[in-house]
Amino acid sequence: MLCLTGATAWAGCSDAPASGVDWTECEKNRLVLGGADLTGARMAGAAFDGTDLQGAKMAGADLTHGSVDRARLSGADLSRAKLVQLNGYRATFKGSNLTGADLTKAELFRANLSAANLSRANLRKTELQRANFDGANLDGANLTGADMARANLANARLDGTRLTQTRMFRTRLDGVDLSRSIGLVAGQLDIACGDARTRLPEGIKAPKSWPCGKDE
């Protein structure tokens, strides 16, 4: 596998997957790397579009400015990974461990994060439109300024989740417990999609009628 043009000169783009490997700005698209040990790997700017990374060990890895568009990362360990400004269009993180990961300004449009563990993750100003968080753990996560338009939060956990200025246009909140979330205001709910089972923080009232139905 050759490095991308302009890739960092010392990056070992042809090196085999290994803990701490340097794949900075390398092209690793459409490969099969399921279960690979990439713990602490240096992969800033690297491309993994369409790559199979299911069950990969990527704890503490650096994928800043990287790309995982349509990649499969189900069950991967990305705990404490640096994923700042990561591109992940339609990427699958189902059941992945993203505990404490830094996803600041990442673009995860239509990503599947169902049943993922995002506890204490940093998702500030992250693009999460139409992302699926069904059954995800977002306890203690920071979603300040994130765009969750039309995202699905059904069955997600949001204990201590910071939702300050989070955009929630048509966000699915059916049956979601937001009672211990932080920074939520009534104006965000006026454009969201909840139901009678949606629990809100003390002092915040639900809209008289939620603005959308289950088919939206």
Regions found by a protein language model. Give the residues of each.
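Bacterial N-terminal signal peptides
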Residues: M1-G6
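Tandem repeat scaffolds
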Residues: A9-E216
